[in-house]
Design a protein with these regions (language model features):
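Short, small-residue-biased leader/transition segments that mark boundaries at the very start
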Residues: 1-3
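Surface-exposed ligand/attachment interfaces on beta-rich extracellular proteins
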Residues: 7-26, 36-82, 91, 99-109
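Hydrophobic residues on conserved beta-strands that form the core of alpha/beta folds
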Residues: 29-31
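Solvent-exposed strand-to-loop "edge" motifs in beta-rich extracellular domains
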Residues: 34-39, 121-123
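Detector for the mature cores of small, proteolytically processed
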Residues: 85-86
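C-terminal interaction-tip segments
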Residues: 102-126
């Protein structure tokens, strides 16, 4: 599990991307889940979405950051087939989470906590 409070997403912009997890060499993520533990808030904020991406491929998208308790999940049968995939046999690979807001910049956030849960595995060395 990776948990991030509003500080990780603080930027004088409407979009920011952070590295939330680094796949090990021969790493696999079989399941992924985003959970809004505490709703994000800011004056004028009308929308806040989170997207989890690996190597430019969305595995979770349009997760609602304004609703406490919101859950977005994916497994091998969903997420465009990008879960259960070995990204590299020789290098680590980053899983990023992008926050995109409307109505307020991300540095105006006054509350919020997002949790990322991953079911991972690693192939043995050849």
């Amino acid at each position: 599990m990776c948990s991030s409070d509003l500080g990780a997403f603080s930027a004088a912009a409407n979009t920011i991307t952070i590295t939330a997890y680094t796949y090990p060499v021969r790493g696999i993520v079989n399941k992924a889940l985003l959970f809004t533990k505490t709703a994000f808030a800011a004056a004028g904020l009308t929308a806040l979405h989170f997207t989890a991406t690996v190597a430019g491929n969305d595995i979770l998208s349009l997760h609602n950051g304004l609703a406490a308790g919101a859950v977005t999940q994916a497994n091998e049968a969903s997420a465009g087939g990008y879960l259960g995939y070995v990204w590299s046999m020789s290098a680590t690979t980053a899983l990023t989470v992008t926050a995109t807001s409307a109505g307020a910049l991300l540095n105006a956030l006054t509350a919020g906590e997002l949790e990322l849960y991953l079911e991972t595995a690693q192939l043995p060395a050849p």
